[in-house]
């Protein structure tokens, strides 16, 4: 198609330059590091991770009151002796700008991450226990949860009190993680990803199957307000 614009200005030139090449559609199916998200050298066996997920779900169902909205959690750690989990235990403090005022506001209560120091005995002997042990040898691990996200679903655009480690267990090419201005796919291949969720971020599942990650909070500093 030959189109001759009636006006030749900077906008026409910008679009013409953009039309001169095709966007990269291959690398979006891979991990690309960026500010706020890095792949660590530590790696686990993806087959054993997926087997452990099925084994744990036979022992305990996903929890949470927002499962119909696509968010479900399975707590892998607990306070010593804990047997019941509140909605706040499964989610916890975050901040967001909710409306046209663009004012940042807190939601939910702060969770003392260091209190969640004990692996959930319901899942003792699973590969997830080994994962937790290996993480705890290297980092100050707080709450560790298995988080499930339904298809065609997205979290809020928010920030957390602390960074998190992500280990994808089940994923698809349409499952993406965004931290501030950087977006990338996290393949489910046993890799461990550092995500600086102290910055604004979200997880979205634009694929046709569920997305399941192990998410471990890094309890270096306890935010108190």
What are these model-predicted stretches?
Residues 148, 159-175:
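Short, conserved beta-strand element in jelly-roll/cupin
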Residues 1-157:
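Fe(II)/2-oxoglutarate oxygenase catalytic core
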Residues 168-188:
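A short beta-strand-loop-beta hairpin characteristic of the jelly-roll/cupin
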Residues 35-39, 162-164, 213:
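Intrinsic-disorder/low-complexity, polar/charged segments enriched in Ser/Thr/Lys/Arg/Asp/Glu/Gln
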Residues 142, 161-163, 210:
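Residues that flank catalytic or metal-binding motifs in active/ligand-binding sites
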Residues 145-147, 168, 178, 204, ...:
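Residues in well-ordered beta-strands of folded domains
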């Amino acid at each position: 198609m030959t189109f001759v614009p009636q006006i030749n200005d900077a906008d026409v030139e910008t679009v013409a330059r953009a039309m001169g090449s095709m966007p990269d559609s291959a690398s979006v199916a891979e991990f690309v590091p960026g500010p706020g998200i890095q792949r660590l050298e530590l790696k686990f066996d993806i087959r054993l991770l997926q087997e452990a997920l099925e084994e744990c779900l036979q022992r305990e169902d996903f929890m949470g009151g927002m499962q119909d909205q696509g968010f479900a959690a399975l707590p892998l750690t607990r306070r010593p002796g804990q047997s019941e989990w509140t909605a706040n235990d499964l989610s916890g403090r975050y901040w967001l700008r909710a409306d046209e005022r663009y004012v940042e506001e807190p939601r939910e209560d702060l969770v003392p991450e260091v209190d969640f120091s004990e692996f959930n005995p319901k899942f003792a002997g699973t590969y997830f226990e080994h994962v937790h042990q290996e993480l705890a040898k290297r980092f100050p691990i707080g709450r560790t949860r298995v988080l499930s996200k339904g298809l065609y679903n997205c979290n809020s655009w928010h920030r957390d009190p602390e960074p998190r480690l992500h280990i994808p267990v089940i994923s698809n090419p349409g499952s993406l993680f965004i931290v501030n201005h950087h977006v990338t796919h996290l393949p489910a291949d046993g890799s461990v990803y550092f995500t600086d969720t102290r910055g604004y971020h979200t997880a979205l599942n634009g694929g046709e199957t569920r997305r399941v990650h192990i998410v471990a909070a890094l309890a270096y500093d306890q935010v108190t307000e």
